[in-house]
Amino acid sequence: MEEADRILIHSLRQAGTAVPPDVQTLRAFTTELVVEAVVRCLRVINPAVGSGLSPLLPLAMSARFRLAMSLAQACMDLGYPLELGYQNFLYPSEPDLRDLLLFLAERLPTDASEDADQSAGESAILLRAIGSRIRDHLALPWVPPLLRTPKLQYLQGSAHQKPFHASRLVMPELSSRGESREFQAGPLLLPVPAQVPQPAARAASLLEHHAIQLCQHTGRDRAGDEDWGHRTSRLPAQEDTRAQRQRLQKHLAEHLRQTWGRPGPPQQARDLGEVLQAWGAGARPGTPKGSRFTHSKKFTFHLEPEAQAAQVSDVPATSQRPEQDTWAAQEQELESLREQLEGVNHNIEEVEANMKTLGINLVQVETECRQSELSIVEREQALRLKSQAVELLPDGAANLAKLQLVVESSAQRVIHLAGQWEKHRVPLLAEYRHLRKLQDCRELESSRRLAEIQELHQSVRAAAEEARRKEEVYKQLVSELETLPKDVSRLAYTQRILEIVGNIRKQKEEITKDAKKDDAVRKAYKYLAALHENCSQLIQTIEDTGTIMREVRDLEEQIETEMGKKTLSNLDKIREDYRALRQENAGLLGRVREA
């Protein structure tokens, strides 16, 4: 048994039970250790059931009984064949505990040893619950949509799908180092989740916005993009002048072909410098004048299509100018634009800081307003009460008598209502007690009938076993009868038996005749009869001794079984739990009386 207990304890440790090293047998298991072992095994076998049970034994007796009943019900649901109740967990005996833990250990999964370190973790329990839920869904048969019940329509239909409705999102575009995230609000923008009124459309809106950003990012590397001027301004200085001129000419031709290829009115374009000047008008007193590069760029983009085409053809002629002047003008213009952009960013950051400060001040002012409103309401109530008291002062005695009458009438009304409530409460309590008594009687009757049904099942099984055994004996006798020779007659056996009986009778008659004639023969016959009688007594004594020895062994086994059940320790635990339960009941009664 000790070797089997060690193997069982090793299985419990693999399932996640913290069994102390000094515990080597099930006899040393405490109530707390039994509850923890059963809960850990249930969590590994069925995470959906075990996750709702606590491995720690609560302090309150009512909570202990509820936990023990839940464990018993969970084990019975798994198919435990024996009787199981709360006493098997709170006051365990060694044989019952061994049967229960062996039953649970047999149902542990084969890979429990591999997941020994993670079997008691919340992540492992969650993964097992997800896997069991997926297996349950895969085990369900597929039903056509027109034949589905409402429950199947919810499980297998399209109830969890949402239509793809996207809304336009506006995100802050800041270039400073303290740039906010996409989900945060800008100085004049709401947060991204608040811009979508429907919660179901938030994911669709974010997906569409990110797809647009991805398309814009991948399209920037193509010829004819809008930022070709910025890329040409960042060309390395060591590159050949002819290659730079050819690349610039190619970009200009491609851009003009895309812009003026279709007939129609020319589009009006705003200069980047004008936009930045409009943003930075409040921060800078004067607007910087455009450089020669800016004016030439503006003039280039505002020409007619014929002039643009002519200018494209004249690019090789004008490209003979000194390249250094062009690069210097571009660098100067870029530097001025950077300064303006930094000024705009600085102004935006200052405005954001001011808005945050104003928001905090606004919250404080609103809080003070609410507090002042509450204080005003309280003062109005106190003023109203004092004004009513002042109105009653001129005729104080009469008003006091009226108030006394009102108080007495209110007290009488309360007493009357209490009497009416008592009239309604008494029959309801009587009916409740009657129904509770009927329920108890029904439960007793159902338990009695259940016991009778179980006894009938056992008797049916015993009768079936007896019938099966007799059927086997009958088949054996039939086979022996078939093996006997067919020519043997029953008459020969009967005659032989009659001859033996006749010989015995003759021998008795001869012995009686000899005993009458000879005294020695008579004494020998008497001694033989006494010897037969003593032998029968000796045989009876030996049989009684064997029966007593069997009873002694049975009693020893019962004593060992009772010692294994730890009856005395369980009785001590029951007494302690009874005292704790009485203390809890007394505390609850005291609270009820105080309430």
Swiss-Prot record:
Region (Sufficient for interaction with COMMD1): 1-321
UniProt region (Disordered), positions on chain: 218-243
An example molecular function term from Gene Ontology annotations: cullin family protein binding
Biased composition (Basic and acidic residues): 218-230
Annotated keywords: Coiled coil, Cytoplasm, Cytoskeleton, Endosome, Phosphoprotein, Protein transport, Transport, Ubl conjugation pathway
Stretch list, region Sufficicient and required for interaction with CCDC93: 1-447
Subcellular location(s) per record: Endosome; Cytoplasm, Cytoskeleton, Microtubule organizing center, Centrosome
UniProt GO BP: endocytic recycling; positive regulation of ubiquitin-dependent protein catabolic process; protein transport
Coiled-coil segments: 323-369, 447-484, 564-595
Pfam families assigned: CCDC22_CC, CCDC22_N
Residues recorded with modification Phosphoserine: 410
Any one cellular-component term (Gene Ontology): centrosome
Function as written in the Swiss-Prot or TrEMBL entry: Component of the commander complex that is essential for endosomal recycling of transmembrane cargos; the Commander complex is composed of composed of the CCC subcomplex and the retriever subcomplex. Component of the CCC complex, which is involved in the regulation of endosomal recycling of surface proteins, including integrins, signaling receptor and channels. Involved in regulation of NF-kappa-B signaling.
Self-association and partners: Component of the commander complex consisting of the CCC subcomplex and the retriever subcomplex. Component of the CCC (COMMD/CCDC22/CCDC93) subcomplex consisting of COMMD1, COMMD2, COMMD3, COMMD4, COMMD5, COMMD6, COMMD7, COMMD8, COMMD9, COMMD10, CCDC22 and CCDC93. Forms a coiled-coil heterodimer with CCDC22; this heterodimer interacts with the guanine nucleotide exchange factor DENND10; the interaction is direct. Interacts with CUL1, CUL2, CUL3, SKP1, BTRC. Interacts with SNX17 and SNX31. Interacts with CPNE1 and CPNE4.
PANTHER family: COILED-COIL DOMAIN-CONTAINING PROTEIN 22, JM1 PROTEIN
Family: Belongs to the CCDC22 family.
Protein name from the UniProt record: Coiled-coil domain-containing protein 22
Protein source organism: Bos taurus (Bovine)
Gene designation per UniProt: CCDC22
